[in-house]
């Protein structure tokens, strides 16, 4: 199977999700920062135009202002259903977010195991179908399975968001081949979500064909979150540039870049 994802010939290719345009392909989570100032500085350094937060935490983060107030006017707010284990709970949480934040967008998370934080595919599919029918723009967090991603897209998901590895582990992309397959087959943008540890992981995701990267812990728990946010900004841009440029083929044998003409003794 040819897994090469067609790419535009120029960099003038802003990301479009459900009719909304983003110039940044880095999305940022909001949890776990040392304080409000560090969070806001990291957000600015990242260049991100969309930030995600659990609806349960929107007014409980401990900042001087609620997260909703902090984010409004700065970025597009993407509420998520973190912690939900059933489609019913996720749908209810999404409805609460829509009422509180006046947005139809939701990052859908339905977890099957509280220790592994791995998606419950059956409940995720049910929730996606129902939320799409209710007019939501659904961005589902899912496993790195091309079949599941295709089903989510068929149900009307605006993106698919496969994990690189388990949430918060920092292990990077455990199965790059599967991520590349998903990118090759998906009719909607692929956003890598979870497991990112450092900037090179984000660059790899973009080189594999992902449309964007969403991360949280890799920045919020870094020794210097602001500097790490800036590193991720450049990594995503660099990875996207590399994808657009097109890497050279891999070969089993050496191939000299200099011509043989003019060699001494030739």
Swiss-Prot record:
Subcellular location(s) per record: Cytoplasm
Reactions that this protein is recorded to catalyse: [ThiS sulfur-carrier protein]-C-terminal-Gly-aminoethanethioate + 2-iminoacetate + 1-deoxy-D-xylulose 5-phosphate = [ThiS sulfur-carrier protein]-C-terminal Gly-Gly + 2-[(2R,5Z)-2-carboxy-4-methylthiazol-5(2H)-ylidene]ethyl phosphate + 2 H2O + H(+)
Molecular function per GO: thiazole synthase activity
Enzyme Commission no: 2.8.1.10
The keyword Transferase appears for this protein: yes
Cysteines engaged in disulfide bonds, as pairs: none
Main subcellular location of this protein, as a coarse class: cytoplasm
Gene Ontology terms: cellular component: cytoplasm
Keywords annotated in UniProt: Cytoplasm, Schiff base, Thiamine biosynthesis, Transferase
Gene Ontology process terms (BP): thiamine diphosphate biosynthetic process
Keyword set includes Calcium: no
This protein's pathway: Cofactor biosynthesis; thiamine diphosphate biosynthesis
Quaternary structure annotation from Swiss-Prot or TrEMBL: Homotetramer. Forms heterodimers with either ThiH or ThiS.
Family: Belongs to the ThiG family.
Descriptive protein name: Thiazole synthase
Gene: thiG
